[in-house]
Amino acid sequence: MMYAPVEFSQTAYPRIEYQRRQQQFWDPIRLALFTLAIVAIVGITIGIVTHFVVEDDKSFYYLASFQVTSIKYRENYGIRSSREFIERSHQIERMMSRIFRRSSGVGRFIKSHVIKISPDEQGVNILIVLMFRYPSTDSAERIKKRIERTFYQSLKIKQLPLTISMPSFSLTPIDSKKMRNLLNSRCGIRMSSSNIPLPASSSTERIVQGRETAMEGEWPWQASLQLIGAGHQCGATLISNTWLLTAAHCFWKNRDPTKWIVTFGTTITPPLVKRSVGKIIIHEEYHRDTNENDIALAQLTTRVEFSNVVQRVCLPDSSMKLPPKTSVFVTGFGSIVDDGPTQNKLRQARVETIGSDVCNRKDVYDGLITPGMLCAGFMEGKIDACKGDSGGPLVYDNRDIWYIVGIVSWGQSCALPNKPGVYTRVTKYRDWIASKTGL
């Protein structure tokens, strides 16, 4: 049923006669004040619009160097994956954060990354990249003076954990390309497209309940290992511009490097970068029946160029230990259900490390977990690696530097209760990797 329109009659309403008001005029002073008020309101409005539209924030990058006299140089400072370099870098980066976050304004200081620690007669020299966000109308030189003033004031107060030589401090504005090149010299750093660091079955065949990757460059070390004519077989992890880390069982059926290709990017089709494989190295003591020593290396015929979307992960020091319930991430193109199809888009899942004592319980894996294996997932199941994820990375975020701690190896089905994923423990094979690659 439709509602009919309501009919109005002019005669239904009495006619109202309004008394005409006598015409009035404002005096000149009141008129002038009113005009000034309107102009002020318009001016404020234009200012606000200009602030948000014209003065968009822009990234500014600087390369700083200074001498620290309270630190004696150690040989391992020259090895970026060493515990000594990592710990000292974090100390310096925390110091820079305290200096600039308090004085640069909310959100102005973004991040710092130590690039190099080198020897000096008086201690050590530090080379570090500093990143800030300021209005685009600001100039790099003006911001540079602001940074220098803030740094010198902090040195005068003498409340820093390190003794820094004031005359040694130098600061140079750099462009985004130079900044990327410097950061690309470090491993395990993720960058967004706007050049801001991003603040997280036992066969070849194995992320259930994960999600699709949010953006290119979120997991830039992830690779797809593909058998020519058969497509995606396994995941792999970029650890240098020519070497990838993967699982030995991925090559069980075919060890001929000429039959394999490697692609990078968040999709298998189309790939972002494609490379041929020149060499395959399988651990000499790999045992397929027990899954022990399930680790292999693949060398590319042509090196890859590091960028925001293709980057190497850090190899951990052999002494790195992760306690149970440490948050880690597994990524891959594997199926999302047991025996399901490979996914074209890269997926990720957050899982937790599980102690070997728990994993070796009779109701879990009943003693099958060896020192070279690492369990991760949840005892209640639901989130896990699966078919097609094998060989891919399990990574750990240590203060925005990412380390590969596991390689997807085996498990009983996918995401079952009391059957977490089992990974090759990378720290156990750190010396083996170094002996084969020099890394």
Curated annotation (Swiss-Prot):
This protein's UniProt keywords: Disulfide bond, Hydrolase, Membrane, Protease, Serine protease, Signal-anchor, Transmembrane, Transmembrane helix
Single annotated GO MF: serine-type endopeptidase activity
Gene3D superfamilies named in the record: SEA domain, Trypsin-like serine proteases
Subcellular location: Membrane
UniProt key word Transmembrane: yes
Cysteine disulfide links: 234-250, 359-375, 386-414
Homology family: Belongs to the peptidase S1 family.
Protein name per its UniProtKB record: Transmembrane protease serine 11F
UniProt source species: Mus musculus
Lineage, highest ranks first: Eukaryota, Metazoa, Chordata, Craniata, Vertebrata
